[in-house]
Amino acid sequence: MRDKSGIECLKRAIFLYGAPASGKSTLGKALAERLGLGFVDLDERIVAEAGMSIPEIFKTRGEAAFRDIESKALKEVVSGIIPKLPTSNSTLAVVSLGGGTLLRGENRSLCEENGTVFCIDTPSDDELARRIGAAPGSRPLGDKAKERAAHYASFPNRVAAFFDAQSSLVVVGRGIAPAILAGRNVVADETVARLWAGRLGISPFAIIPSGEEHKTPVAVAKLWRAFSERGLGRKDTVVALGGGVTGDLTGFAAATWMRGISWINVPTTLLSMVDASTGGKTGCDLPDGKNLAGAFHFPKLVVIDTDFLETLSPKLISDGRAEMIKHEAIGGKGAGVRGRNRPLRVGATLGEATEPSGACAEELGVSTKEIAANLMVKVGIVREDPLETLGRRILLNCGHTVAHAIEKATGYRVSHGEAVAIGCVEEAKIAVRRGLAPASWPEEFAARFAAANLPTSLPGGLSLDELVPLMRGDKKRDGGAVTFALPCGWGDVRGVKIDLSKESL
């Protein structure tokens, strides 16, 4: 909801809505816990009020009577949450609604006037049927999802949710950031602060300069000083609002402040949404290489709000596509990636960021569901090997050994997404030379990146041999050997150890 100036109106409650068995109560409890908010399950309130289960209410009194009880309970819940003050500077509670609560117009108006309604994207029909079948009779109207599809689709704010490793909750949706950020300890990227702070109604207590060149120990020390001046203690939570650099630095500062405080990651670029936001890796760069100082410190909550994509240039959208295509190489062709980019409707052609355009994610060529599906490739691997000790997680490094060397060799003039695209193609060529992939594979792989407007060959004046000394400093080295994650085909990425002091690439 916006006021007449176009500024997001502050919300006082998060209402979760959606089809029966879509996960409203599970998500509500997890979200409230991580935000330190109260949680209300409307169905539980109804059962307590009526003194009988919901199936029993339907059986003995009928649906109309149930809806009356539901409406009364909702009014009581809302009146109990909303303070008798004209304004509130933070979200106060998370409320899980029933699968048909907002069919009544007055209930919908009540929720939209006093909070933000987020409709949970319905799982597949098979998964929905499995969940309903797991507790037969517990959901009297569990078969109404298809019938109500248009009703659920009328809610513009959508969310999907799943867990990363170590109970890190990932929420992907549209329009959820304002409710999460209100009243919190926010660290923001300087560009994001300029474009979004006023619109979100927040005042970041620390600002991080934009750009990989600022991802240094000095920046971490400045954050520690800001944490101290803010008075952050062991029970506090800090929020990172920005791209991958902001998340890495804020997460590392949180990991090391008072031996570890909680943090929430709110990525604002497509690249950080589909890559750095999950997995728990935090850190900073050193003169010898990228991310050499760091820690595994999973955020307790990751909030991916596709509204932030409005301010991205086509170049930054393409940067994010590079990581999505990398995930496709790991998970198999079509794993959460469209075959080609849709036309992009953004304000800038060359710039790094613009004022919010009002375009939704789908108009920008990326959908919320696509981001969630792509992220699941990475999350599935991280769950198996959260601290990179079993070897499985090395697959996520596909293309990155060469990419990091390119970034360092060019003084980070080549963006991370561009470097990943080039690195993936170069490492595909290495796979061919080692007899691990067919000769046609690098060209096919390169075509995928080219379709996303990404470069696929080394920058002028650079050769692979010239990058080898930089690769020897890779953090995944073991003596003189470096483990590459070589792309050998769609769904076929292999960890291969190469001794760069003895072997040619």
Show which residues each predicted segment covers.
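ATP/NTP phosphate-donor binding region
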Residues: D164-T237
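ATP-dependent small-molecule kinase phosphotransfer cores
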Residues: E44-K84, S88-E112, G142
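Active-site segments that bind and position negatively charged phosphate/pyrophosphate groups
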Residues: E363-D465
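A glycine- and Lys/Arg-enriched "phosphate-lid" helix/loop adjacent to the NTP-binding pocket
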Residues: E56, E113-F155
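C-terminal charged capping/lid subdomain of soluble metabolic enzymes
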Residues: A322-I325, L436-L505
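Walker A/P-loop
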Residues: S25
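NTP-dependent small-molecule kinase module
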Residues: G6-C9, R34, T116, A149-L169
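A glycine/threonine-rich phosphate-anchoring loop and its flanking beta-alpha core
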Residues: F252-K333
